[in-house]
């Protein structure tokens, strides 16, 4: 349905019998009303055409072929001539065959039938409204015992108003035998009620507002009593109070949605459109049918049998009628939810029939498979791995996935740049994976974000936008900082990638869904892009060099032997820890590390900017090195000061490692990038 704001929505609930008939009924030009399915047949075995008034009737559900009736006559759909809309011979409407996807029918039940979802599902809505135990209601619905029916302002023979017959044990077996005697039909119908009809009468007599008032009064009385001191009694009172709250909420829901309680008992059973329960012909002429068709046939067979028994009620024993009503109830239960009452119904191959509940519920049901989690175009899925070289807003997309997702954009780019004359030539170039294809693909991807989603999407950070980058392999590369938002781990987790097509979707992805714009948790406001797991280990490895300073390392007698043995040999350079190298800038230090002249933890001296805090420090140097030109080096625990002959300070060196330098450069670049972004916004 579509609301006043033009939002498409789906509402599931009870409907009245009048609404069910309005969905299905059609009036022919001769005044005949069609819509009721009365025959359990599907297709005629000779003509292979739908049976009239059957489960695939063209009069009820529409033509199989657009504009062609059952007689074979053809008429243009939407023709403005004054030709009749229905065929005069067969009564089939000249409409599009797609009507068979939504045109419904109905089965007029010979007796009321309780909807098993409202009776057997927990909590039982019928039991809550009637304030009766579920076991008693089940016995009444399935004709295991009877109910004394009070007639308004008239005394009954039993004088039992609203009580179950089992309450009087001496009458438990005598009442059914007495009132099912032949010739007592009128008397029996006046005094005894059983089956779903008894439930319907009680639901029809309910006043929901009175239920709310009485339940509220009882709840207050129980609350005022206080604890009794008996644990069992206190639990019983607590359960009763919880039940009263659920009962009031249920009654309010019925009032708010304009649903009558008696609608939970069916008089008309809706029949699904034929296209939703198809019969398909496979190789060899064999037919494959939906299980729902067989369950519908079972209902129609039993309902027609009950109708025949009721039309000849004078010669039919009452117990036989009650047993047939029970069979109709069980057939409808199997159609709606097979196996809810115990042993499910099976076919000849011992396979359980799929009921209506099985079709719509679960991971492979109608909602989750075809509406909520259905397969969509321009999407793919792969395993995620760490992409340490990526920016926060980037993701690595495998070439194999990218060339499929962006194929239409790639074809357009090849044709626009006159690299392909038509679509066929462009597809041929893509299949051959020519070098120009990858260049055009990179241009297409440069301004087109993609969406990454990890199921289950429990909050809005479960799907975020990224700028795709082509990578080798078959795994999607992801920045480790966005892992927490997706609640993902790099141990085999899979993620889906989607391509937003419209300009509106791309704008929304850029403005609202980019990963670098979702740094805080929407629930509590804490930072969600924080280093964890591998990143913490990496930070520890980068900064795990000796931090005890030169005094503890060089002059510790326990470590002096290690200094003699620990060295890095290279063809052009020889370094020992007793001779720590000097570097003018961080680029030289990282270059030496990449050429394997020093390792990640090797202490070194890095020239640093003059710092007044170090110059003004009153710390005494550990040692002083004098040079021949008169300059000298004052060596401290973590830094070194170079002084001239005039005691001026031309430069300062700090003692660090390549790991510390790399971490500092990353932090510095991040701060500079943030400052540039802030300056652009202002």
From Swiss-Prot:
It comes from the Eukaryota. It catalyses: RNA(n) + a ribonucleoside 5'-triphosphate = RNA(n+1) + diphosphate. InterPro entries: DNA-dir_RpoC_beta_prime, RNA_pol_asu, RNA_pol_N, RNA_pol_Rpb1_1, RNA_pol_Rpb1_3_sf, RNA_pol_Rpb1_clamp_domain, RNApol_RpoC1. It is found in: Plastid, Chloroplast. Binds 1 Mg(2+) ion per subunit. GO terms for molecular function: DNA binding; DNA-directed RNA polymerase activity; magnesium ion binding; zinc ion binding. SUPFAM superfamilies: beta and beta-prime subunits of DNA dependent RNA-polymerase. Its EC number is 2.7.7.6. The keyword Kinase does not apply. Keywords: Chloroplast, DNA-directed RNA polymerase, Magnesium, Metal-binding, Nucleotidyltransferase, Plastid, Transcription, Transferase, Zinc. GO terms for biological process: DNA-templated transcription. One of its GO terms (cellular component) is mitochondrion. It holds the Pfam family RNA_pol_Rpb1_1. Mg(2+) binds at residues 489, 491, 493. Zn(2+) binds at residues 69, 71, 87, 90. In plastids the minimal PEP RNA polymerase catalytic core is composed of four subunits: alpha, beta, beta', and beta''. When a (nuclear-encoded) sigma factor is associated with the core the holoenzyme is formed, which can initiate transcription. DNA-dependent RNA polymerase catalyzes the transcription of DNA into RNA using the four ribonucleoside triphosphates as substrates. This is DNA-directed RNA polymerase subunit beta'. It comes from Vitis vinifera (Grape). The lineage of its organism: Eukaryota, Viridiplantae, Streptophyta, Embryophyta, Tracheophyta. The gene is rpoC1.
């Amino acid at each position: 349905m579509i609301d006043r704001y033009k939002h498409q929505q789906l509402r599931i609930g009870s409907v009245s019998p009048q609404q069910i008939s309005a969905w299905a009924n059609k009036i022919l030009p001769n005044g005949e009303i069609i819509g009721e399915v009365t025959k359990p047949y599907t297709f005629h075995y000779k003509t292979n055409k739908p049976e009239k008034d059957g489960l695939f009737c063209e009069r009820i559900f529409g033509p199989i072929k657009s504009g062609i009736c059952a007689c074979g006559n053809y008429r243009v759909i939407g023709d403005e001539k004054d030709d009749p809309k229905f065929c005069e011979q067969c009564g089939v409407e000249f409409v599009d065959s797609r009507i068979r996807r939504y045109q419904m029918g109905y089965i007029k039940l010979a007796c009321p039938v309780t909807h098993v979802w409202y009776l057997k599902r927990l909590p039982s809505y019928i039991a809550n409204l009637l304030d009766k135990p579920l076991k008693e209601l089940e016995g009444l619905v399935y004709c295991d015992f009877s109910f004394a029916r009070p007639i308004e302002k008239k005394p009954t023979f039993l004088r039992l108003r609203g009580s179950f017959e089992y309450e009087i044990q001496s009458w438990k077996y005598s009442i059914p035998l007495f009132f099912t005697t032949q010739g007592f039909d009128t008397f029996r119908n006046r005094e005894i009620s059983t089956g779903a009809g008894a439930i319907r009468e009680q639901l029809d007599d309910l006043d929901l507002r009175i239920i709310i008032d009485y339940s509220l009064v009882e709840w207050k009385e129980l609350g005022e009593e206080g604890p009794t001191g008996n644990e069992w009694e206190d639990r019983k009172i607590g359960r009763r109070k919880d039940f009263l709250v659920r009962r009031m909420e249920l009654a309010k829901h019925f009032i708010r949605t304009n649903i009558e309680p008696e609608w939970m008992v069916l008089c008309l059973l809706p029949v699904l459109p034929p296209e939703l329960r198809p019969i398909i012909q496979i190789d060899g002429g064999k037919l494959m049918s939906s299980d729902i068709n067989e369950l519908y046939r079972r209902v129609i067979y039993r309902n027609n049998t009950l109708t025949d028994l009721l039309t000849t009620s004078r010669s039919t024993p009452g117990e036989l009628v009650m047993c047939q009503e029970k069979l109709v109830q069980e057939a409808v239960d199997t159609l709606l939810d097979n196996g809810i009452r115990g042993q499910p119904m099976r076919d000849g191959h011992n396979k359980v029939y799929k009921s209506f509940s099985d079709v719509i519920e679960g991971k492979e049901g109608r909602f989750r498979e075809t509406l909520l989690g259905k397969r969509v175009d321009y999407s793919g899925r792969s395993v995620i791995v760490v992409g340490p070289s990526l920016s926060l807003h980037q993701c690595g997309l495998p070439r194999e996935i990218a060339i499929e997702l962006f194929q239409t954009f790639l074809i357009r780019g090849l044709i626009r740049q006159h690299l392909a004359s038509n679509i066929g030539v462009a597809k041929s170039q893509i299949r051959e994976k020519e070098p120009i294809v990858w260049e055009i693909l990179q241009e297409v991807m440069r301004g087109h974000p993609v969406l990454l989603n990890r199921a289950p999407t429990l909050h809005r950070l479960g799907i975020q936008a990224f700028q795709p980058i082509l990578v080798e392999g078959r795994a999607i590369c992801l920045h480790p900082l966005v892992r927490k938002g997706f609640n993902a781990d790099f141990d085999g987790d899979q993620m889906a990638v989607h391509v937003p097509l419209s300009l509106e979707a791309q704008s929304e992805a850029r403005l609202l869904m980019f990963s670098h714009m979702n740094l805080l948790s929407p629930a509590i406001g804490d930072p969600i892009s924080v280093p964890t797991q591998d990143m913490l280990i990496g930070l520890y490895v980068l900064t795990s060099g000796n931090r005890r300073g030169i005094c503890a390392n060089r002059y510790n007698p326990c470590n002096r032997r290690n200094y003699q043995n620990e060295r890095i040999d290279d063809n052009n350079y020889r370094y020992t820890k007793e001779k720590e190298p000097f570097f003018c800038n961080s680029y030289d230090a990282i270059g030496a590390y990449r050429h394997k002249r020093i390792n990640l933890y090797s202490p070194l001296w890095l020239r640093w900017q003059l710092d007044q805090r170090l110059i003004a420090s009153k710390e005494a140097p550990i040692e002083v090195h004098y040079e021949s030109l008169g300059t000298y080096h004052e060596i401290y625990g973590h830094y070194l000061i170079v002084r001239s002959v005039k005691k001026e300070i031309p430069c300062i060196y700090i003692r660090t490692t390549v790991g510390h330098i790399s971490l500092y450069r990353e932090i510095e670049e991040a701060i500079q990038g943030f400052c540039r972004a802030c300056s652009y916004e202002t």
